[in-house]
Amino acid sequence: SELPYIKQLFIPPFTGDNGTSYVAAKLGMPKTERLAPAYWGPAFAAESVEKNPQKFKLKYTKKEYINDSVAELLGQNKIVAWFQGRMEVGARALGARSILANPTQANLRDYINAKVKGRELWRPFAASIIAEKKFDFLTEDVNEPFMTKAIKVREEMAPRIPAVIHVDQT
């Protein structure tokens, strides 16, 4: 925290009204050391996605080496809809359902906001960073699995990833 009197702050992954029932139930449960992952939404069979890509105007392909294929597409400045397992609960896409794009291309940020998500152009995005590289990009040593905190990016790195830099350098 940038406030010296706050040593630690926990923000749950679902801070909206949908989190109230969770917290109420959690208060009646035995204490645990760690909050479980937020993947409590519905799961969909691969077959339902394979049968209906045209319904959503998507191009669906199944690859043996999906990570390599996605990296190649991102390198070509393509936008990838990532969908796996159960959906997250809450407002943040935490990796089970995410829109992936090349963070070096500011025009992709604007395109996703306007055409894909249909939201205001100023709305920020979050970057996924390999843990070993977080010190190269971030000003704090943090682990934010629920994307509940905005973290400042090192000044010298911001120009390298303009699509995920907000006006406040987070």
Go through the PLM ranges and name each one.
Residues 2-170:
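Flexible beta->alpha loop and helix N-cap segments adjacent to enzyme active/binding sites
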